[in-house]
């Protein structure tokens, strides 16, 4: 391994140790701290070797609220790891959560590979199905809002738990930007938003994801799930909470948290 590969592996080991050990990093040691996006992505690839199979990507900070939440100025791609995927209605662990927020998102299941250099229309055309989703992001950094883009890329863009909900039928003719979203916690409405909050439209976020991955020499693949970011300001959650993400006439998806 070259020096950069070795440093990326050390970064990944530090992050994975915090992830599995249930503690937070104040800051990475200077000698293994990523200083640019390429370093951060290399560390995320090394993290994937520790975290196990991935099945797609999340797109963090596609809304102004999301960017403010984690202290960045542009969206960041992060791998979704299979060990942290759950079905609708699941009870997620509360212990060890640091961010303690929940997000209502639109997610796409890709039907075929997307070649490098594809247009936005070609990226959307490669989609198989659209789904409603809930993400419970998390970070291994104590002060994630000050960690910076390279470190957050290494941290899989604050990947955490993910729930892929029901398929939306006949979605291609819908104005997803106008689609209203709500998060209800224990029967009370906690947040509202709309699809336009993710780069104007979830389709635009998907196309932007393809462009972001291209920066790192990666493309979208068939059967990958791509979730496009929070449509609302993420509300806080607590142990024993029941969360329902409502997408108007498109449907809903729910999840609960252990006491």
Q: For each of these PLM feature ranges, what is it?
A:
Residues 218, 226-241:
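Structured functional modules or segments
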Residues 212, 216-219:
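DNA replication sliding-clamp ring fold and its partner-interaction surfaces
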Residues 205-212:
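Short, well-ordered amphipathic alpha-helical segments that serve as non-catalytic structural scaffolds
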Residues 2-201, 215, 238, 242, ...:
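Catalytic-core "active-site belt" of small-molecule-metabolizing enzymes
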